[in-house]
Amino acid sequence: MATPNKKNKYDISFEVFPPKKDGEFEAAFEILNALATHDPAFISVTYGAGGSRSGKTVEIASYIQNKLQIDAVAHMTCVGSKKDDILAVCKALKEQNVCHILALRGDRPKDMSDEQFASREFAHANDLIDFLHQNTDFTIAGACYPEKHFESFSMESDLNNLKKKQDAGASFFISQLFFDNDFYYHFLEKAGKKGITVPICAGIMPITSAKQIGTTVSLSGSSVPKALADIIAAYSDNPEDMRKAGIDFCIRQIRDLQENGIKDIHIYTMNKPKMAAEIMANILR
């Protein structure tokens, strides 16, 4: 199967992040219980920088897979990892019946020297995908960038890298968040011409505060369309109206994708189940 669990006409999946502290697991489980009521195709779990919170990722992924009986996709970054580190995390995931990994390069740790960065065992995400494909039986996903990765020289270069990920063993992709669907539609067309044949889930992040948009754009490099900029300008001083308008924008964005034939949507929930519920009540399933 391409994506973990195809069961609805429109398959919606969620991203969550693990708790930062050991004492926060019960709250995290409650969030997951709420998200599970929406019958997602899968739930992905983010990974600490350099694997610093990989144990928490494994525990959350285990709860999703074993307690909730929903396919868990564990994020795995490799920029600061050795091959033995990767295999150890794979072993821990397998012991918890987790069979899906989203393979990412990850951000360079602040304490990583130039020498360490230059000599790292995994230079790019496709190296991790290839290693996992050759040494494990996980279903492997990769990331893609409708507006290109900020480090890429051009979209052509970025698409070449995406093809390398597919050739290395990625069976589906999850896109970086975007706010303008035209970028995604054009990206799909270009990816198809490049020979990308595996599914590409559309990554969608609801914007519910003016502060959030600045952080999100700086981290993702995503463009802000006029319609969203107008919402921020109109409601930045009114948090509740900003939240409502941001969720409405997200719903309209997803509905447009669905009406244009996009069946796989991945929602970056930011661990906010109430927000996710409002979105799920207003999109196609």
Residue ranges and their predicted role:
Residues 44, 102-103, 174, 266:
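Conserved beta-strand positions in the central sheet of alpha/beta enzyme cores
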Residues 16-19, 46-50, 75-81, 106-107, ...:
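Active-site beta-loop-alpha junctions enriched in small/polar residues
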Residues 11-27, 72-84, 141-157, 234-248:
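Active-site mouth loops of central-metabolism enzymes
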Residues 23, 119-145, 195-247, 252, ...:
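Active-site pocket-lining/capping segments in soluble small-molecule metabolic enzymes
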Residues 1-14, 19-24, 131, 229, ...:
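N-terminal amphipathic alpha-helix/helix-capping segment at the start of soluble metabolic enzymes
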Residues 31-46:
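Catalytic domains of carbohydrate-active enzymes, especially glycoside hydrolases
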Residues 15, 43, 93, 165, ...:
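Conserved, mostly hydrophobic/aromatic
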